[in-house]
């Protein structure tokens, strides 16, 4: 069977277009690259809830519960699991940590008791092993 002379050229052109298209898609989301993520995503929200819980259990030495005033940034990175990066501004509430229901605690508005803190968290989740942990955090008073 004899192929027309332009057939190899067409195949080569098609291959080059396919490779260029896939390289373009890869440049937008690199494996291991950090990119902004959606706070409404269930797994992102679970990682953020974990960071907030650990903040109040381990990092926040105050007797009052703190909750987020604002999540300023959220990123994720696919590694051997998922790394989540959060920048969160916390506010002190009127509820002490010993109270049973802390979800609806109002923020403390009294000047002497009002306190805010900015924290950056790196959370690692390995879903298939059911593991989640804080790899790194840094907090400062605002």
Swiss-Prot record:
Main subcellular location: secreted
Intracellular or extracellular location(s): Secreted
SMART domains assigned: CY (SM00043)
Chain ranges for the short sequence motif Secondary area of contact as given in the UniProt record: 70-74
Gene3D superfamilies linked: 3.10.450.10
A single Gene Ontology CC term: cytoplasm
Tissue: Expressed in submandibular and sublingual saliva but not in parotid saliva (at protein level). Expressed in parotid gland but not in seminal vesicle, prostate, epididymis, testis, ovary, placenta, thyroid, gastric corpus, small intestine, liver, or gall bladder tissue.
SS bond list: 95-105, 119-139
Database matches in SUPFAM superfamilies: Cystatin/monellin
Residues of the site described as Reactive site: 32
Keywords per UniProt: Disulfide bond, Protease inhibitor, Secreted, Signal, Thiol protease inhibitor
Leader sequence segment: 1-20
Record carries keyword Protease: no
Function recorded in the entry: Cysteine proteinase inhibitor that possibly plays a protective role against proteinases present in the oral cavity. The order of preference for inhibition is cathepsin S > cathepsin H > cathepsin L > cathepsin B.
Similarity remark: Belongs to the cystatin family.
Subunit structure: Monomer.
Protein name: Cystatin-D
Originating species: Homo sapiens
């Amino acid at each position: 069977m004899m192929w027309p002379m332009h057939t190899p050229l067409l195949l080569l052109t098609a291959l080059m277009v396919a490779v260029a298209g896939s390289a373009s898609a890869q440049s937008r989301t690199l494996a291991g690259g950090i990119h902004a993520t959606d706070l409404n995503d269930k797994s992102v929200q679970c990682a953020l809830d974990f960071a907030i819980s650990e903040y109040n259990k381990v990092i926040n030495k105050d007797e009052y519960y703190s909750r987020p005033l604002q999540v300023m940034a959220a990123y994720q990175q696919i590694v051997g699991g998922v790394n989540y990066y959060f920048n969160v501004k916390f506010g002190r509430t009127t509820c002490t940590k010993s109270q049973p229901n802390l979800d609806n605690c109002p923020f403390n508005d009294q000047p002497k008791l009002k306190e805010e803190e900015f924290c950056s968290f790196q959370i690692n989740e390995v879903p298939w092993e059911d593991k989640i942990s804080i790899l790194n955090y840094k907090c400062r008073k605002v």
